[in-house]
Amino acid sequence: MVRPSDPAPMPLLLPPRAGIIRQIRRAVQPSGQPRGRRGVSDAAGVSIKWRSNVNRFILTLCLTAVLLPAPAHAQLEPLPLDEGATGLAMAIRQLGAGASYMEVTAHPDDENNGLLVMLNRGRGLRTSLLTVTRGDGGQNELGPEILEALGILRSAELMAMHRYDGAEQYFTRAYEFGYSFSVEETLEKWGKEEILADIVRIIRTVRPDVVTHLPTTGEGGGQHHQTTGRLAREAFEAAADPERFPEQIQEGLRPWQVVKMYERFRGMGMCRGSPSTEPVPAGVTRMDTGAYDPILGGTYAQLGAEARSMHRCQSMSQLRGLPGEATSLWSLENSAIETDDRETDLFDGIDMGLDRYKDFIRGQETEAAFFLEGLEALKGHVGRAEETFDALEPWKTLPALRSGLSVVRQLRADIVASTLSDDAKYDLEHRLSLKEEQFTRAVALAHGIALEPLAEAGEVVPGSTFAVDLLVANQSPEPVDVTTVELVAPEGWTLRRSGGEVSGALGAGGTLSGSFEVRVADDARYSRPYWERNHTVDRFDILDEDLLGLPFAPAPVHARVTFRSGDVDVVLDEAVRYRYEGAWVGTEKQQRVTVLPALSVNVSPRVMVNPTGAESREISVDVVYKRTEAALSIIHITEHTRPYK
């Protein structure tokens, strides 16, 4: 037996893939002596050294071990409304839309869900949500996660929410530090210029036409809400000024003038049960989110309520929304165009269709003659796709969709070779690159193409090998030719085809399947958040600047398939994922491949304050081993004390 005064470690034999190998719970008395037993006889082989100490102390357990990364969060499946005929109907709406919208909020659950659904699902506009913080300082009704871990959970809930509203998600570096006494304090803690720079960067990147934000006064909620509103207001002019944050311009971004900016009216700007005919003050615009959409099978507010229910750690209602009046109110704050004080829509004065693109070539109509001609052709193909859409035979839209895709690609090539101004080229390319992605997805939906890259394991370690099975299916009577199939992985990973054939002709209802062997690089980076808490300021340090603003780092392994439909090539890209049955009620769960340490140690609590005379406290040590072969490991647990002052 190793006595408490003996510092010699004991070996710990780790069986393969043991998961949580051992949980050591020791009762600690203020004297430093384990209560009830002397020494360590646990088979886990952990040596603990206890020393006498001063009257009051802080006990910290220090382990030489790899920090346990954040656990992989479930990647939920797409909703049925994004698949089949309904998904194609949604996609065709996007093809004819040329405008974009962004909402700026302080925390997850501040957003106007019904409006996001209305603009994205109902009108096909590009929509985005810029949430300044990840909600790290909030409460958690589901589990023990707090602070940074809670921020990860709430970020994942936002991604689950966006399955309903279709919006893109962005974040700044701001840390949600909890209650604030003033806007000034919030700006000081976050760093005004740093967070304003993030907001400006995201606006310059996404280039929205209309931006809405939270109220800048007390009716908008807490100090974080008001601060976010003020920063968004300042970003209206800053994003358009090349002298503000010039380093972004040097990196390749260009200034962007938001056309109109609105502030929420009356707090959250959401009202239920009030008649849509009730008059509103001058300068206030009402959006009818209670309108019924037959494709969605409900109102925008109803689908928005389902989206909002994803904020489960914040105890959002799980009851489905009921049909009826639902509106959101917005006060015009700034505009780059002439406006009427009796607007009926946030996009009054802005073309929401493809003619929005014409605004980028004003004064260059002669040089842009080719573009104007191509744009008219594109609008015609979109119109024919709308006319030929048939829920029972969605592939009837393929001729129009393929023609539209070809026009977009030709326009992009012609713009590069044109004499248009650099600014015009930049903004047209920005919009048309998204349009090509939308046409690509629409063609795949019309064919009923399914790409399923499934890994045999969701958690892997450096140096390990795992299999990926890939299935490609054509669920329409229109044949396609699968020309290339590949896996894409980080540098240093090795990929090998191990069986099957996933290229060739794919007829009606046909499938192709194959297998790949993937070896993780010995020095592979662990899957973890790309942001890290800076404990000197309430702002995150960014570990990879290329990812700034994104919800999470991209999946490490992707499957990429190219197929030929008619005379156009279509490329599909899907993250390789692992599927499993969860321990709770529901359908299958999915997660992306996650790289974890082979050996992880977690101590709880990490810091313990235990005054003299206090009751015994429990210390828990969890060891997780992920490799397939057994190993011998030695773990030390030591006590560090310091006087209480």
Segments (PLM) and residue ranges:
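The feature marks non-catalytic terminal segments
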Residues: 238-443
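Asparagine-centered strand-capping/turn motif at beta-strand->loop junctions
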Residues: 472-476, 623-629
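Eukaryote-biased detector of low-complexity, proline/serine/threonine-rich segments
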Residues: 503-575
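Residue-level detector of conserved catalytic or cofactor/ligand-binding positions
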Residues: 632-643
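Bacterial N-terminal signal peptides
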Residues: 58-69
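Active-site rim/loop-helix segments in enzyme catalytic domains that contact anionic ligands
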Residues: 75-205, 226, 230-237, 241, ...
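Low-complexity, acidic Ser/Thr/Pro/Gly-rich terminal tails and inter-domain linkers that flank the onset
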Residues: 415, 421-463, 579-614
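Short terminal hydrophobic/aromatic SLiMs and anchors at protein ends
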Residues: 2, 14, 21, 30, ...
